[in-house]
C-alpha cells in the first residue's frame, strides 16, 4: 500500500527516472483519482472525507509535477538529495550568460520597435532551445550526473522565465 509519504513515482507505480511513459502516467493518475476522488466518499464520515481529499490533492500535485519535465527533474534531484540552488546559485557557464544577454537585448529591441514578428521568432527560438535542453537534461539525470543536471535545471528555469516575458510582451503589443 502506498502512503502519503511515498514518492510521486511510487504513488503511480512508475520507475523513479526522468524518462517517463506519459501514457502510463496518465493511466495511473486516472486509476488513483478514481480510487480517491472525494465524490466516492460523499456518504462517508468527516475523517474519511478529509483523507480522501488529502489523497486527491496529493495525486493532483504528483501528476502535475511528473507531467512537467522541469518540475520532474527538480523533484528527481530533490529525491537524490541535490538542491538545485535556484535561489542562491546563479553561477552559469559563460556561453549561457552570453546567450542570456542576447535574448534580453532581442526582447528590448523588438519591444521598442513594437516588432511582434521578431518576438514570435524569439519565442520559437526559446522553445527550440528548451526542447534540446530538456533532452540533454534527461540524459544527465538518467546517467546520474546530478550536479550537471542541477545546472541544466537552473538554465531551463531561466529560459522559461524569458519565454514568459516574451509572451507577455507579445500580448502587450497585440492589445
From Swiss-Prot:
SUPFAM superfamilies per record: Chaperone J-domain (SSF46565), HSC20 (HSCB), C-terminal oligomerisation domain (SSF47144)
GO cellular-component term (any): iron-sulfur cluster transfer complex
Location of the J domain: 7-79
InterPro entries assigned to the protein according to its UniProt record, in alphabetical order: DnaJ_domain (IPR001623), HscB (IPR004640), HscB_C_sf (IPR036386), HscB_oligo_C (IPR009073), J_dom_sf (IPR036869)
Pfam families registered for this protein in UniProt: HSCB_C
Protein family according to the UniProt entry: Belongs to the HscB family.
Matches recorded under PANTHER family: IRON-SULFUR CLUSTER CO-CHAPERONE PROTEIN HSCB (PTHR14021:SF15)
Protein name, entry field: Co-chaperone protein HscB homolog
Organism from which the protein derives: Burkholderia cenocepacia (strain ATCC BAA-245 / DSM 16553 / LMG 16656 / NCTC 13227 / J2315 / CF5610) (Burkholderia cepacia (strain J2315))
